[in-house]
Structures are given as structure tokens and as C-alpha cells.
Design a protein with these regions (language model features):
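Generic N-terminal leader/processing signal
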Residues: 4, 27, 41, 50-52, ...
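Enriched for short, Lys/Arg-rich terminal
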Residues: 2-6, 12-13, 55-60, 65-95
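Alpha-helix boundary/capping and short turn/kink residues
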Residues: 20-23, 38, 80
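Arg/Lys-rich, positively charged N-terminal/basic patches that mediate binding to nucleic acids
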Residues: 1-29
């Protein structure tokens, strides 16, 4: 049972601004998430059904929401971790 990855329109714009090397690193991790998206250690508090992918060396984060009914992973936000920027963006997009 594999999940499909989709992007919110605003998250796709953020994705396209990333360096290709960063995109490739995220793509590799997203592919793994398609098999098992519910990673307990990556679960975000305060945002329902959302998880994060961290790229420690570059400081980038990707926030995704898991929709089990339709087997979809929706990328909600992509950005730097600085001042919790990406997490604030993600929570704003659910309001």
C-alpha cells in the first residue's frame, strides 16, 4: 500500500525555489515516506496529521500531511527551520 505525493500550490512554489541538490535529498526521503508515512518521531504537535522531514546539514524542513482515506501525502510547506519559519507557515495554511 503506497501513498501518492501531492503539493499544495504554495508549497510547490517553495519547492521550485530550492537548489536541485536539496530537492533530490527531499525526494529521496519522500519516496521512503510513501511506504510508511506515519513516523512517530517526526510527528508535529499542534498540527493534525502532519509530520516533518529534516535535512540537518542544510537546515531545511519539509512539512507534510497524511490523508489515509485517499492514500495521499500532501506537502504543506518547505523552508528553513530558522525561527520555526516553516512550522509557522504550515500552521497558518491550516487556518
Amino acid at each position: 500500500m503506497s501513498y501518492t505525493v501531492k503539493f499544495r500550490e504554495d508549497a510547490l512554489k517553495e519547492w521550485q525555489k530550492l537548489d536541485k541538490a536539496i530537492q533530490q535529498q527531499f525526494a529521496k526521503k519522500l519516496k521512503k515516506c510513501c511506504e510508511n508515512p506515519h513516523i512517530t518521531s517526526a510527528k508535529l504537535r499542534g498540527i493534525k496529521d502532519c509530520y516533518k522531514i529534516k535535512l540537518r546539514t542544510s537546515g531545511f524542513r519539509l512539512v507534510y500531511q497524511v490523508i489515509d482515506d485517499t492514500l495521499v501525502i500532501v506537502v504543506v510547506a518547505v523552508g528553513k527551520r530558522e525561527r520555526s519559519e516553516v512550522y509557522n507557515l504550515a500552521s497558518e495554511r491550516f487556518r
